[in-house]
């Protein structure tokens, strides 16, 4: 049972931890349903009817909001306001402004807020009692109350954006997990937050195994700020979101040209629709036109796990209704302009190359020493008829003089090289 206490509004605002403290990034948490607002944009209904909020806002359970960028809401003010996320605003999606008010009620010793609008001259109060964001007129019940929880450097222990790796069971050869992201806000990679760095992909190369590889190139490390609208790969220490923390900072960004592109990576905000709206100027409100889906294409490969169980960029699998929408807030590899016709798997990592040959390193241990002399001597002494007893040597390295065969001359040259090193 939640403890509801009537307090003086000003005292609540000063003493409580979770509160609106000026323009910035927040999560909006319903008291009654214990769910969070996220801006999804799966449907649009630009009208003055407050029910227009219902299709463009999805309420998330606590476990889901941790890793969903759509739950990171930029709130500019408490007056006639709009909620900004995913490159759009609730005003541009619905045509409705919100009035956010600090109430005189505290819940769990934290101040709560009311979200209001006006419809046909009647006040409406937004609520969530488990069926999504709807408007009512009565108020007073827990589902009408909202906590506004800051997401910033000071809140990192309790409120952050956590990254969910593309697969929590498959790491790279060094034990790192990988995630992708594309968001409308800059974010920092905090020290000891679990995210080692942000990476891009600049090229795809073939390895000596005749497979293709995309080697991540590090562009930002811990303590750095990743700019908004830049699709990146993120190298993560943990298999779960709470172990891979990033923090939104700075000003929210807008970009009317989606998908967003950086090197060979592309990214999006929404899954189902492109973003065509600029909320920078009031006269452009309402221009959000969902005319194109962010669909998979032959040259788009998403990060996942290959058939042989390795991290790789592969084609997006079709869903049950045969739609191949690319997931929201992700980055994918665009090989459209590369000469890779028919290539459907590109492994994440450095392409294997021919090992460097050290002249005289007959044993193949990477060091030129007396052991190499013994290997060549053994190789030459054992008769060809006793091939199975010959020492295993690197013929190319043992052929020190490069005449195409291993001989006593090579032994002499190896010994001479060792003496010169001393």
Language-model segments: which ranges?
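Positively charged n-region of N-terminal signal peptides that target proteins for export
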Residues: 1-4
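Hydrophobic h-region of N-terminal signal peptides that target proteins for export
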Residues: 9-18
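Lectin-like carbohydrate-binding module/patch detector with strong preference for beta-trefoil
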Residues: 19-157, 255-262
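Short, flexible beta-strand-to-coil junctions
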Residues: 29-34, 41, 86-90, 116-119, ...
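Acidic glycine-/aspartate-rich tracts in secreted/extracellular proteins
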Residues: 41-45, 105, 119-121, 237-241, ...
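Surface-exposed turn/loop modules enriched in turn-prone residues
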Residues: 45-67, 177-210
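Cellulosome-associated attachment modules in secreted, modular CAZymes
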Residues: 50, 62-64, 68-69, 352-422
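A short, polar beta-strand/turn micro-motif
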Residues: 145, 150-195, 221-354
């Amino acid at each position: 049972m939640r403890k509801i206490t009537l307090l003086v509004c000003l005292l609540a605002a000063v003493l409580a931890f979770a509160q609106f403290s000026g323009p910035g990034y927040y999560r909006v948490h319903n008291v009654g349903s214990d769910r969070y607002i996220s801006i999804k944009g799966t449907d649009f209904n630009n009208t003055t009817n407050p029910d227009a909020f219902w299709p463009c806002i999805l309420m998330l359970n606590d476990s889901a909001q941790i890793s969903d960028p759509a739950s990171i809401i930029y709130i500019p003010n408490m007056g006639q306001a709009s909620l900004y996320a995913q490159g759009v605003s609730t005003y541009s999606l619905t045509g409705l402004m919100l009035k956010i008010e600090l109430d005189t009620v505290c819940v769990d010793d934290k101040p709560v807020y009311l979200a209001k609008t006006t419809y046909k001259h009647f006040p409406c109060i937004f609520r969530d009692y488990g069926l999504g964001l709807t408007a009512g007129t009565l108020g007073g019940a827990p589902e009408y109350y909202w906590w506004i929880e800051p997401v910033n450097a000071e809140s990192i222990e309790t409120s952050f954006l956590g990254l969910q790796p593309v697969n929590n069971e498959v790491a790279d050869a060094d034990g790192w997990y990988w995630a992708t992201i594309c968001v409308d806000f800059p974010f920092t990679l905090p020290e000891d937050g679990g995210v080692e760095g942000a990476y891009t992909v600049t090229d795809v190369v073939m390895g000596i195994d005749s497979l293709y590889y995309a080697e991540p190139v590090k562009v930002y490390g811990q303590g750095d700020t990743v700019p908004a609208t830049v699709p990146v790969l993120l190298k993560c220490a943990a298999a779960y979101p709470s172990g891979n923390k990033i923090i939104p900072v700075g000003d929210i960004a807008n970009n009317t040209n989606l998908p967003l592109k950086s090197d060979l990576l592309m990214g999006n905000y929404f899954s189902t629709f492109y973003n065509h709206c600029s909320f920078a100027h009031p006269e452009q409100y309402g221009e959000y036109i969902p005319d194109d889906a962010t669909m998979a294409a032959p040259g788009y490969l998403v990060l996942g796990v290959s058939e042989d169980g390795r991290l790789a960029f592969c084609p997006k699998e079709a869903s049950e209704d045969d739609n191949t929408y690319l997931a929201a807030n992700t980055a994918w590899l665009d090989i459209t302009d590369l000469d890779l016709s028919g290539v459907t798997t590109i492994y994440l990592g450095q392409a294997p190359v021919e090992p460097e040959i050290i002249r005289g390193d007959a044993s193949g241990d990477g060091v030129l020493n007396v052991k190499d002399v013994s290997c060549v001597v053994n190789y030459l002494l054992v008769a060809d008829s006793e091939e199975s007893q010959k020492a295993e040597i690197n013929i190319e390295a043992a052929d020190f003089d490069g005449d195409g065969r291993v001989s006593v001359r090579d032994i002499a040259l190896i010994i001479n090289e060792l003496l010169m090193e001393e």
